């Protein structure tokens, strides 16, 4: 693998935090990443608030939509629980 290929693969890795309470969870994602995930921005529901340049993607719908779009574009998604 060339250095260019290795660097290209490294930029395709994203790390996010999953925040939860007793009844729900949200994935904390920078607004830029939501914008870069093709077709996701316009499909985000009102259950996923945008605060301080970060979306909190609700687990039942928006989190999966974002995850699927990113993995379809070759990204590796790492999620840690808070």
Regions found by a protein language model. Give the residues of each.
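N-terminal, charge-rich interaction modules
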Residues: 1-16
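A short, structured beta-strand/loop element
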Residues: 21-51
């Amino acid at each position: 693998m060339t250095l260019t290929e290795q660097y290209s693969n490294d930029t395709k890795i994203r790390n996010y935090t999953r925040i939860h309470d007793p009844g729900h969870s949200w994935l904390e994602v920078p607004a830029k990443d939501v914008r870069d995930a093709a077709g996701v921005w316009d499909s985000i529901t009102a259950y996923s608030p945008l605060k301080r340049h970060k979306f909190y993607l609700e687990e039942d719908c928006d989190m999966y939509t974002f995850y699927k779009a990113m993995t379809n574009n070759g990204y590796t998604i790492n999620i840690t629980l808070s």
